[in-house]
Amino acid sequence: MSVSFMSYKIRLYPTKEQENAMFNHIRAARFIWNLMIEKQRNKYLEDGSYISKFDMIRLLTSIKSENLWLYDVSNYTLQGACSDVDTSYQRFFKKITKIPNFKSRKRSKNSFCVIPNETYIKKKSGLLHLQKIGDIKFKTDFSFPIGRGKMKLANSRIIFEKSGKWFIYFAMERENQASVLTNKPMGIDLGIKETMVVAYGNESITFHNINKSRKVRELKKRIRNLQRVISRKYEANRVGKKYIKTNNIIKLENKLIKLHARLNGIRHNYIHQCTHKLISLLPCRVVMEDLNVMGMMKNKHLSKAIQEQCFYEIIRQMKYKCEWNGIPFIQVDRFYPSSKTCSCCGAINKRLTLSDRIFICPECGFTIDRDYQAALNLMRYEV
């Protein structure tokens, strides 16, 4: 039985004292990052070489002796910052990303690593223990093993989001289930009018566009109105070419961040519900298109709607959930004419445009909804 890692995101509720300690860890991680970036650049200018991860960790002893406040921070957090610098440079050497830069207090992501072995749920109190921080209240719907050394974590990290909430992210091993699959294949067509149109055997399943729901429309309206208020306040506080950010503007921007986070949460939760429902049907295989989302985004009339649909997230969730349940996942080439091919006779209607919602076969006269037609062709696709 294969093994994979499952990622978790858990909300934390620290006290004021614990929150100050966590902010101190964030400052320390950023301080070490910037210091190591500076040392890497100086080393390169000297002899064109690179400081390895282990050499950076060895430097921590002398750095801590010069900065005594770092003794209040977990040593694993400091080592994690060195590891992050090394990872960033390795990705730069492979030409995956740009060269690592200094982190700003205002613009950088507020996060730090925590030691996996010392992160566990206490038996008596049921609180989450974090080294150098203490026992923290948390909220989750998942059940975890209780006791020291029971939670075998990987890549554990604390993050303070812009919405003002604390979370811990980590991964745990899980055994992929060898589920008993049905003999029905599944074809999934993604779209803007409907989020997903699914062909499953002789069944048709449609997941409506969550962005057209009343809840999302009202939330987007609140965001638009708040953006107008903030824009007018900036104009009212303009001095020459400079804009003065007042306390009221900061409060409104924090409120706007929380609304965006809520909207994003609604969309992602809906995708999780849809993908879970499809995977629970246990099809013998799942077939989807390999969409060119970047190319589709170039259409100025559809780019916003495509962005709101989160196509990449839908495909990503279907991939890993299929892997967990032992379901073969197939992605068809993006140039496969799933919408233009007649599901009855196989003829291709090359004149079909985006505005045509009904497919009419030029050969046999077969009429069908174009999205369901695409889902049927994907379901019947053979590698």
Model-derived regions, located:
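Non-catalytic, well-ordered alpha-helical scaffold segments
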Residues: N20-F23, R27-R30, Y76-S83, H272, ...
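Alpha-helical coiled-coil heptad-repeat segments used for dimerization/assembly
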Residues: N24, F31, N42, G80-S83, ...
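A generic secondary-structure signal for well-formed alpha-helical elements
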Residues: W33-Q40, Y44, Y89-I96, E194, ...
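Stable alpha-helical structural segments in soluble proteins, enriched in small hydrophobic residues
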Residues: M36, T77, A81-F92, Y372-V383
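Acidic carboxylate diad motif detector
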Residues: F54-E161, E308
